[in-house]
Amino acid sequence: MFFKKIKISKSIDQIFYFIFMTLLGSCGLHHQNLEKKTELIGAFGFHFGAKVQGYEIKSEEDELMIVEPTVIPRPNSLIERYALKLDRKTKRISEIIGLNHSFQQRQCLQAKEELVSSIKERYNFEKTESLEDLEFRPKKSVFYGESANKFGVVIGCLMNIGFVYSNSDTLLIIRYFAPSAKNSMQLLFQ
């Protein structure tokens, strides 16, 4: 009789455990999902602090160079163009930028939300902010996330801009930045 109670008790415990884990999994709180989050060290196969071999210089400032890499190690299908900000002296990467200017407004907003969702699942952010202004020109919807070690990302959709080089007036941008990138919080308002 005593052993039957133990078996029934174990079965009930197992059922409750199964239900509990199923609920946690459906809410996105399962312990394995939390363990899979990684630190932000780069994007598209580029790593912060690394030197880039092949690139075309787009602009130069006192401390920075903006370059377009000739080879993308891990391209993303949403991104049409890539740019890197390099320290002018060391030629090391401080920012990684991906751009797409062929989306319609609704597509841009949807792609931005998908990117934000994916980024939040992948990385731990200590600080996040969102900015949405769809009333005034240029319209914008921006997400900012920064980790405890000050690496971060800005994902934005800017609309009604009026590009000279494109038929679209919409820009999807994703900017990954290292702590060495100055004024990272100002990226929200650029």
Each PLM stretch: what is its role?
Residues 1-11:
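N-terminal secretory signal peptides that target proteins for export/translocation
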Residues 10-21:
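Sec-dependent signal peptide recognition
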Residues 13, 86-89, 108:
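Intrinsic-disorder-associated interaction segments
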Residues 25-26:
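C-terminal motif of bacterial Sec signal peptides marking the signal peptidase cleavage site
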Residues 31-69, 100-190:
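Non-cytosolic coordination micro-motifs
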Residues 68-92:
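Compositionally biased P/S/T/G-rich terminal and signal peptide-adjacent segments
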Residues 92-102:
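Acidic/histidine-rich, surface-exposed loop or edge segments in extracytoplasmic proteins
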